[in-house]
């Protein structure tokens, strides 16, 4: 074909003889190319109808005569003939080779750019439009987006009916009629006008008829164009009134006897379309094209209310399930907290037992020795630290236990005899010792006037003393007051203890301590201690001892010095 570059798919190339050239050879006539099947302005259609155009199209291009031996049906089968579309993307220009443009086309090397065969995606990247997600919108054919050209049916993938990836559905509902099959050359073509839309656009379809003897028509998927929308957005059924043109259109189809076949074809196309959507949902994520198709179908057939009802029912079910889920979750959390508490109790018990077992046993501290407290009015004579003092008890004094045992173990006892009165010397070890004695008063009227008996009942603190000189027997002992305190004296001194019960009205007891020995005392007699008593022989305790502090009250201690 000389200078013949067809810029449309082969299936849309039609050779149509005009009425004025019926007697001539059809091959000598000019041909017209159908680029698209979409609404056209009514003025254009009227001009075309006045010229008795056999084929209605938006654009018609006159091409040179087809060379002898080559007809329209042989163009697709001829491998030597290449069909190309000039495309642009931004400032870049390239050529789309249609026979290499197969579904899905995005990564197929079908674009010739700078003598290189690249894919449309690569071409968009080289043109600097890679930020656009849709490559069909980035590529333009004659100033029109490639997606819009494919949605309107002006161009399609090569042999799309045989090779399809199921990911190439258009976003327009009128894609159902985009793959119209061209009429066979030599057939007469009649024009059927669809209803006029509100903006003045009309939709037209071409119906090829055979000879008058044959009443049948060859229908294919392109005949579903009778149900296309007047505009790209479609006409809502509930908002439009049925016009007279619409009524005449469908009445004409019914009069011809094609209503049943049209309905069957529409049903098949709808089933295939919806089945394809379901299959793509299984194979790949939901796509924008599927959403557009479903939206157009729902709006066309008034199914949006039904879809909303389904959504409401599902939302109620989800809310009920969510409430049940939250209740179950709260119950599980409560059970988990209880189990945690139960698990922590044995741990605490075991930890307590372990702490008790591992706790070091602390031995109780030995009790402190009671501190000896002396009256503040007394003069304390500290003993010599070199010589250990000893306690000497001079008999005749017998200690008889009353009420409790009294132990004098490990105490050296020396018995001395002088004259008729035995003297027993008890030597006590150094250090403070605590003895409890009872207050017992023995008068001169007793059987043994030289003996005083002391019973353990009260507190008597023996501090210190020195060794006593041997003395004679004690005479005229009448009274001895207890409790009494023996005060420590320095070593080498002869102590004279006199217990005298005063006959005065205040009844004080005076204990006189003479640190110096009696110079007039006879060495042979060895008088060391003189106990003088008054005239009164009745028992009178003036000194009081506190239980815990062991202090002597109301006792006056007088130290006599030379």
Swiss-Prot record:
GO terms for cellular component: cytoplasm; nucleoplasm; nucleus. It comes from the Eukaryota. The modification N-acetylalanine is found at residue 2. Residues 360-384 are annotated as: Disordered. It holds the Pfam family SAND. Residues 72-156 form the SAND domain. One of its GO terms (biological process) is positive regulation of transcription by RNA polymerase II. It is found in: Nucleus; Cytoplasm. Ubiquitous. Low levels were detected in heart, brain, spleen, lung, liver, skeletal muscle, kidney and testis. Keywords: Acetylation, Coiled coil, Cytoplasm, DNA-binding, Metal-binding, Nucleus, Transcription, Transcription regulation, Zinc. DNA binds at residues 129, 133, 136, 147. GO terms for molecular function: DNA-binding transcription activator activity, RNA polymerase II-specific; DNA-binding transcription factor activity; Hsp27 protein binding; identical protein binding; metal ion binding; RNA polymerase II cis-regulatory region sequence-specific DNA binding. Residues 311-355 form a coiled coil. Its main location: nucleus. Zn(2+) binds at residues 103, 160, 164, 168. Residues 375-384 have a biased composition (Polar residues). SMART domains: SAND. Homodimer, and heterodimer of GMEB1 and GMEB2. Interacts with TRIM63. Interacts with the glucocorticoid receptor (NR3C1) and NCOA2/TIF2. May interact with HSP27 and CREB-binding protein (CBP). Trans-acting factor that binds to glucocorticoid modulatory elements (GME) present in the TAT (tyrosine aminotransferase) promoter and increases sensitivity to low concentrations of glucocorticoids. Also binds to the transferrin receptor promoter. This is Glucocorticoid modulatory element-binding protein 1. The gene is Gmeb1.
